[in-house]
Amino acid sequence: MVAFKSDFLNTLQERGFIHQCSDFEGLDALASRNQVTAYTGYDCTAPSLHVGHLLSIMMMHWLQQTGNKPIALMGGGTTRVGDPSGRDETRKILSYDQIDANKESIKGTFLKFLVFGDGKNDAIMTDNAEWLTRLNYIEMLRDVGRHFSINRMLTMDSVKMRLEREQELSFIEFNYMILQSYDYVELARRHGCNLQMGGSDQWGNIVNGVDLGRRMGTHQLYALTCPLLTTSSGAKMGKTAAGAVWLNATMLPVYDYWQYWRNVEDADVGRFLKLFTILPMGEIAKLAALQGSEINEAKKVLATEATALLHGRDEAEKAADTARTTFEQGAISESLPTLDIPRSELASGAGVLALFVKAGLVASNGEARRQIKGGGLRVNDVAVADDKMVLTPDHLTPEGVIKLSMGKKRHVLLRPA
């Protein structure tokens, strides 16, 4: 490990956030003598951010905790274009109303991790639509576009991958990297920003911003990326059988979020405690050292602490209690995720495949059939043996619900409405 002078870089390194930096020595010197103002951008492509965004959010959290100033940049402008990074097809163009609605929906996530206000190191939230929508096209070409080499842009991974696969790359997407670079320059001018952080897939775009700042005469700018989120087995994190692990409780119940962290691989527990909780490093070391069945206790701590950061301590403890009631006592907890089903639908017989899909426990009827063959789906703790099974009021428990389960840890209660 490198011995940095600044608390900021030492903290990020100790907890495993650092992947690449444009100039470690220069950034460390700056952070050790002055306040760093850093930003991370978030496009508004969905009503919620997901677990994949957490690394960069936690980087901003530790930036602020070490006395520096974070900027959460909403991509109200860039979302109108669409980031081609990591995409093998053109993003769907969203309406302006949908982008605005998504932006409002994700704003609250940052309030859980950052302190906003007018203080010296209080966080700022801004939207690149403020300047991107006011740009004059001809002036943009003359003042900004002339600094970009098509030759270099064609070597960017996001562009090269699409071209090599002979997949269409629209002109509007090709311009995304120019807009992101300009964001950096604009934030440097408006807020004295001197660092952009993001995932390693954004490295090329961020470095382009550093270079554009130099060419346009801003102060020295820096780039810092975190690794992409993967499990110890190399699988990309952030997805379950039911879809993305959303951060908004309206899109993923708190209990499911808790269970996501409870179910991580044993080898990932120590690393994820460093990245996704604010527990002291000494306590993390003790938890990471647990072996055998004891590692499950560390997983419960990870799940509760990660959930508490996002949804609050009370909700995290409630999720932990629900898991304890469900698994250790074998009871049906009222805190399990619920799905209302019309009484008329149940009375006429509801197909089990469609109900498991509707409950979010599987992604499709085909997956439900595969799970049934493997004994993975249960109704009221009894394995489903027939994919043509229908549920009726006869399946209601004394509590007036039907318990759907996939595996041992994922449950949804059907409640007649």
Swiss-Prot record:
Predominant cellular place of this UniProt entry's protein: cytoplasm
Alphabetized GO MF terms: ATP binding; RNA binding; tyrosine-tRNA ligase activity
Swiss-Prot/TrEMBL catalytic activity: tRNA(Tyr) + L-tyrosine + ATP = L-tyrosyl-tRNA(Tyr) + AMP + diphosphate + H(+)
Domain (S4 RNA-binding) ranges: 350-417
Signal peptide bounds: none
PROSITE patterns according to UniProt: S4
Extent of motif 'KMSKS' region: 236-240
Binding of ATP, residues: K239
HAMAP family referenced in this protein's UniProt entry, alphabetically: Tyr_tRNA_synth_type1 (MF_02006)
Assembly with partners or alone: Homodimer.
GO cellular component: cytosol
Top-rank EC class of the record's enzyme: ligase
Protein name per its UniProtKB record: Tyrosine--tRNA ligase
Short motif 'HIGH' region, span: 44-53
